[in-house]
Amino acid sequence: MSILKQASLWLAGLLLLTGCGFTPKGQVINRADINSVYLSTPDPYGQLTREVEQQLRFAKIDILRHPDEHMVQLRVGSEQQSKRTISLYDNGQSAEYELGYGVQYQIIQPGKEPLSFTINIHRDFLENPQQALASSREAELILNEMREHAARRIIRRLTTLEP
């Protein structure tokens, strides 16, 4: 009886999760049915470009190397980074920063008006002046996380467009 009850609960939970459209983190479902896209970026070898390409591969979307007017085009603009002091120590040194990351991009579908979007991400960062090297490494890791998050948001928007 207990095994049957436990199996029923698992089945009910599974049906509930699949019924509401739940997908594991990082998994991209291509609802727009896009098979290939032309990717244009200011820095073809930059970190953001690599992140976007990786997310396109996860979504099983081929990347075209030459523009085609009959295919979807993804034009990613340059990255903007900012650093703003939020709080200070007693001696006047910065204690906490707000790191900002932004990128603009455009999705061009054949026969439709281009769609322009902006992504802005902000994270707080505590500065420890006694561990300057560790603090700069942590800031770099936070920037990479924001870049990865932006790439996921770009591809999520691309894969949920109306055909």
For each feature predicted by the language model, list its residue ranges:
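N-terminal segment of the mature soluble domain
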Residues: 33-80
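Bacterial N-terminal signal peptides that target proteins for export
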Residues: 1-9
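C-terminal/domain-edge helix-coil "capping" segments
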Residues: 133-163
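Surface-exposed short loop/turn segments
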Residues: 75-118, 124-140
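C-terminal motif of bacterial Sec signal peptides marking the signal peptidase cleavage site
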Residues: 17-19
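Short, low-complexity, disordered segments immediately C-terminal to signal peptides
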Residues: 27-32
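Sec/Tat-exported extracytoplasmic proteins
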Residues: 56, 60, 107-111, 129, ...
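Bacterial signal peptide processing site
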Residues: 21-23
